[in-house]
Amino acid sequence: MFTKRNKQKDNRRKNGKGVMQMIKEEIIKAFKKMHEQHPPRGEKTVYVTDLLHCVLRPEEEIPPIQLIRGTVIHEGIEKLLKHYSELEIEFEKEVKKQYGEYTLMGRLDGITKDGTIIEFKSVHVPPEFPYEQHIYQVLIYIHMTEAKQGIIVYIGSNEIEEFLIKRDKVGKIETWVVERMETGEITFAQYDINDEWIYKQIIAYVTKTLIAPFQECKFCKLNKSCKFSKIR
């Protein structure tokens, strides 16, 4: 009798585990199916996100669960703000600009009525200063759209950090300001984002010479074996 009950418990555990595993697999399959429905890019089309990553980075570097988590958070935040916020935000706005023979395309997470670009980033712990590639992503969008400023919103497991990026002048020198909005801490920085710089990045990506452009090396699993690694 004791043995029979144990077997029944084991069967229930196995059945429960099977259902849970099935749901996990269905989530991953549904996510892949969603991405397969995206229209294929044109031969001369480059995405803004292409300019932010090393061409040597392994394609499977980002685990699918992490991508799914980011997608769910993005869509949840968008739905929340769209239905319950008083801010007027246009979500998922597609932007494009021609650079020589190439079309640079991007998709803004959001842009407010007054021309502030919003980029949401899902992380476990928000940084004390934005990651370099995220700053450049916003700056490229600002340049493409002629927006006045941008905000990076890091959504962590237990906290949210916002960073405002805008132009300013120190004396006669035009510079960029990165402000941590919760504390008011301000950092001045020089970022030379213009058509020439963007076109060079596009050519580097297309010719597969865009190597270790930002801070990716510290997160890359090849950082100890890659000869271009900035981590030593």
Curated annotation (Swiss-Prot):
Q: Which InterPro entries match?
A: PDDEXK-like_dom_sf, PDDEXK_AddAB-type
Q: Which domain of life is it from?
A: Viruses
Q: What is this protein called?
A: Uncharacterized protein 6
Q: Which organism is it from?
A: Sulfolobus islandicus filamentous virus (isolate Iceland/Hveragerdi)
Q: What is the lineage of its organism?
A: Viruses, Adnaviria, Zilligvirae, Taleaviricota, Tokiviricetes
